Amino acid sequence: MTDATTNGAIGAGTLTGESLRKFFERDAITVSRDLLGCHLTVDGVGGRITETEAYFPDDEASHSFRGPTKRNGAMYGKPGNVYIYRIYGVYWCLNFVCHPGSAALIRALEPETGIPRMMERRGTDMLTSLCSGPGKLCQALGIDIAINDRLLDRAPYAIAPSAPVPIVSGKRIGITKNAEAPWRFGIQGSRFLSKPFR
């Protein structure tokens, strides 16, 4: 489904301290939309966020649905905290905390900096597939549990907002509960998505 509006991402410069808190201390849908176009780097490797999903504490598809646990503790951190978890026992996934227990999953990114390192880590030189999914993105950026549970203004992370971009929205991917919620968001027309929007 195509969204007729753009997101509200504005400003320039890296988000730190109070600006980081203000950006993320909002509902997960708003944050997920406004993350589109933002520039994310991990140890200098990264690019433009092109696809996100929103999750809430009362959302059966969310890790926080049954409350805090040892595994999801980072999801209850401060706004702008990083929550990393593993799926299928293999792939890492990157999330940013909004309100406690709610988060934005980063699903895809358009590579911009450190591309040779991404290609080496991913074992491919196909630009559009380097970060076209949450697991691929984490592999390309060298993300694992060792850099979980820290704010985005702390090394090795850096994130900067962008001008508004046109967005599309649709159902989230790979879930069976609350699967109809249209809480997946992407940059309209981007070639750097995990899957096309329909």
From Swiss-Prot:
Pfam family, one: Pur_DNA_glyco
Keyword field: DNA damage, DNA repair, Hydrolase
Any GO molecular function: DNA binding
Gene3D superfamilies the record matches: Methylpurine-DNA glycosylase (MPG)
InterPro entries assigned to the protein according to its UniProt record, in alphabetical order: Formyl_transferase-like_C_sf, MPG, MPG_sf
GO biological process, one term: base-excision repair
Broad enzyme group: hydrolase
PANTHER family on file: DNA-3-METHYLADENINE GLYCOSYLASE (PTHR10429:SF0)
Name this protein carries in UniProt: Putative 3-methyladenine DNA glycosylase
Lineage, top ranks: Bacteria, Pseudomonadati, Pseudomonadota, Alphaproteobacteria, Hyphomicrobiales
